Amino acid sequence: IVIEDNKPEAIESIKNAIRPEDEIEVKVLKTKYPQGAERQLIAAATGRKISSSKLPVDAGCIVDNIDTVIAIYNAVCESTPLIRRILTVTGDAVSRPSNFNIRLGMQYTEVLEGAGGYKTAPEKVITGGPMMGVALFSTDVPVVKNSSALLCLTKDEVAQYEPSACIRCGTNLH
């Protein structure tokens, strides 16, 4: 189990829950962004490099985030299908940034109402994270199983940058 070092309570909690016979290792990584992509995470945690033609399982690894692990547990142990999701609503344009446990299929518009709506008109609304998220042109779309966040950004929060030949391949991060 890999956890970044900026989450000391999670590290302690997981370590206390693991029994020696579980044969589970907790690997604490230095906090670094971006580091959450599968290949980056495997390299940081194990030192193994995976070519783009290979899968994580080829390196003896499975990479799942906590939401996926919980969904697997609920499906296998509780016979509960994936019907809910924790969604973070944040950004300076939203009145009350919050985390919500919502039903899949709920409209982002409804979730925003739960966060008090906009306190100022957003310059950009993104579903997902700031690096890999997707801009929404309307919040009248449903939350789906891979939704994790709704970023409601003001003009000041939206990065202004010059166009460049960079395709964000990540090569210069190593």
Model feature map: region roles:
Residues 1-3:
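Short catalytic-loop micro-motif centered on adjacent basic/acidic residues
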Residues 143-154, 159:
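Glycine-rich and small/hydrophobic secondary-structure elements
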Residues 12-13, 38-39, 136-139, 162-163:
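Short, well-ordered secondary-structure micro-motifs
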Residues 5-108, 114-121, 129:
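Hydrophobic alpha-helical positions that pack around
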Residues 107-108, 130-134, 157-158:
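Short, catalytically relevant binding-site loops at active-site mouths
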Residues 159-174:
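Cysteine-centered iron-sulfur cluster-binding motifs in ferredoxin-type domains/subunits
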Residues 87-89, 119-148:
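Ubiquitin-like/PB1-type beta-grasp interaction modules and other compact soluble beta-rich domains
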